[in-house]
Amino acid sequence: MSNPSPQAPEEEASTSVCRPQSCSMASASRRHRRERRFRRYLSAGRLVRAQALLQRHPGLDVDAGQPPPLHRACARHDAPALCLLLRLGADPAHQDRHGDTALHAAARQGPDAYTDFFLPLLSRCPSAMGIKNKDGETPGQILGWGPPWDSAEEEEDEEVSKEREWRQKLQGELEDEWQEVIGRFEDDASRDTQEPESFSAWSERLAREHAQKQRQQLEAEGSCRPPRAEGSSHSWRQHEEEQRLFRERARAKEKELCESRARRAQEAQRDKGPEPPRAGPRAEHPRGAERGSLWRFGDVPWPCPGGGDPEAMAAALVARGPPLEEQGALKRYLRVQQVRWHPDRFLQRFRSQIETWELGRVMGAVTALSQALNRHAEALK
């Protein structure tokens, strides 16, 4: 007759080994069920219950699921769910099985989803603009913006390569200077510091430096090739006239902006009525004047006064450039305009100067103008 008592320790050891594994599996299963319940609440629009569930169980992953919750909210045009997910810590750079981020999903919804979905995601995670999916596309390429000019790779002759290197160096210095000036105005207490450089001053300085470089190149070419001196002088006179018209229009726009700001400040003061002066330095800066300093759609210095049709604005820019017979000069001129009106560059430089409720309309017009300029540049190849 066998004695079963020696097998008891082995059975107890086996049970003690299996028990932690079964507990961890049960815990993971409960977590997955709660995450599925969280996604069902979001799909049904029960946002209060979804938030309460996450507060009771803070260890849940709000990005779990395929597609992730942020992608689903963009596909369903569910703006409240998107805002709740961003507030709960969802990651806009999280990728699904196709490599798409939430910005890819928002860009595929078209222009209607730009303000309510694309801009909030871009503000939360600007670095996601550089993430490519498995097809090699970025969110900007899905919107039709195309890659920035300084990332394009194409074969060029020596003269065009030197021109591009100079422009990139100048752009980098301008961006650094612009960011340094804007950083002084992030705090409300530093209002008495120097004002940032206006768009007209920036464009005037850029045109002046570019004209100086063109003058030096023309002088060097004239000394080497005397028979073409007459044609070069004619092209230079035309370029000088274009730069003068551009500076006059920029100064007129700046004057119009100042008059508009002063008029809005006077109207706000007249509607408010006389008030006793308040002590302190902040009494000199009423809120009306602060709001009046932001651009509306008509305040942006468009190629045509007040904006208008993007094709017409692109045609106006091309008409101001060199004649079609001078293919090289016209291509260089169009590249400068492509850089100036590229949506990424425009948004990076002037977002803080535009009214928030006008930002979607302005960026839509800038995107359309950039695409029209790209088509003109492609037609010259």
From Swiss-Prot:
<dbReference type="GO" id="GO:0140416">
    <property type="term" value="F:transcription regulator inhibitor activity"/>
</dbReference>
<feature type="compositionally biased region" description="Basic and acidic residues">
    <location>
        <begin position="205"/>
        <end position="218"/>
    </location>
</feature>
<dbReference type="InterPro" id="IPR038753">
    <property type="entry name" value="NFKBIL1"/>
</dbReference>
<dbReference type="GO" id="GO:0071222">
    <property type="term" value="P:cellular response to lipopolysaccharide"/>
</dbReference>
<feature type="region of interest" description="Disordered">
    <location>
        <begin position="1"/>
        <end position="34"/>
    </location>
</feature>
<keyword id="KW-0539">Nucleus</keyword>
<dbReference type="GO" id="GO:0031665">
    <property type="term" value="P:negative regulation of lipopolysaccharide-mediated signaling pathway"/>
</dbReference>
<dbReference type="GO" id="GO:0043124">
    <property type="term" value="P:negative regulation of canonical NF-kappaB signal transduction"/>
</dbReference>
<comment type="function">
    <text>Involved in the regulation of innate immune response. Acts as negative regulator of Toll-like receptor and interferon-regulatory factor (IRF) signaling pathways. Contributes to the negative regulation of transcriptional activation of NF-kappa-B target genes in response to endogenous pro-inflammatory stimuli.</text>
</comment>
<dbReference type="GO" id="GO:0005654">
    <property type="term" value="C:nucleoplasm"/>
</dbReference>
<dbReference type="GO" id="GO:0034122">
    <property type="term" value="P:negative regulation of toll-like receptor signaling pathway"/>
</dbReference>
<feature type="compositionally biased region" description="Acidic residues">
    <location>
        <begin position="151"/>
        <end position="160"/>
    </location>
</feature>
<protein>
    <recommendedName>
        <fullName>NF-kappa-B inhibitor-like protein 1</fullName>
    </recommendedName>
</protein>
<feature type="region of interest" description="Disordered">
    <location>
        <begin position="132"/>
        <end position="167"/>
    </location>
</feature>
<keyword id="KW-0040">ANK repeat</keyword>
<comment type="subunit">
    <text>Interacts with CACTIN (via N-terminal domain); the interaction occurs in a pro-inflammatory-independent manner.</text>
</comment>
<feature type="region of interest" description="Disordered">
    <location>
        <begin position="186"/>
        <end position="298"/>
    </location>
</feature>
<feature type="compositionally biased region" description="Basic and acidic residues">
    <location>
        <begin position="237"/>
        <end position="290"/>
    </location>
</feature>
<feature type="repeat" description="ANK 1">
    <location>
        <begin position="64"/>
        <end position="93"/>
    </location>
</feature>
<dbReference type="GO" id="GO:0005634">
    <property type="term" value="C:nucleus"/>
</dbReference>
<dbReference type="GO" id="GO:0032088">
    <property type="term" value="P:negative regulation of NF-kappaB transcription factor activity"/>
</dbReference>
<dbReference type="GO" id="GO:0032720">
    <property type="term" value="P:negative regulation of tumor necrosis factor production"/>
</dbReference>
<dbReference type="InterPro" id="IPR036770">
    <property type="entry name" value="Ankyrin_rpt-contain_sf"/>
</dbReference>
<feature type="modified residue" description="Phosphoserine">
    <location>
        <position position="151"/>
    </location>
</feature>
<keyword id="KW-0677">Repeat</keyword>
<keyword id="KW-0597">Phosphoprotein</keyword>
<feature type="repeat" description="ANK 2">
    <location>
        <begin position="97"/>
        <end position="134"/>
    </location>
</feature>
<feature type="compositionally biased region" description="Polar residues">
    <location>
        <begin position="14"/>
        <end position="27"/>
    </location>
</feature>
